[in-house]
UniProtKB/Swiss-Prot annotation:
This is Histone H5. Histone H5 performs the same function as H1, being necessary for the condensation of nucleosome chains into higher order structures, and replaces histone H1 in certain cells. Erythroid cells. It comes from the Eukaryota. GO terms for molecular function: DNA binding. Belongs to the histone H1/H5 family. It is found in: Nucleus; Chromosome. GO terms for biological process: chromosome condensation. One of its GO terms (cellular component) is chromosome. It comes from Coturnix japonica.
């Protein structure tokens, strides 16, 4: 899951 946060998706934080 941390990988998703590091991924280029500042406008779409899947972890949030």
């Amino acid at each position: 899951t941390e990988s998703l946060v590091l991924s280029p998706a500042p406008a779409k934080p899947k972890r949030a």
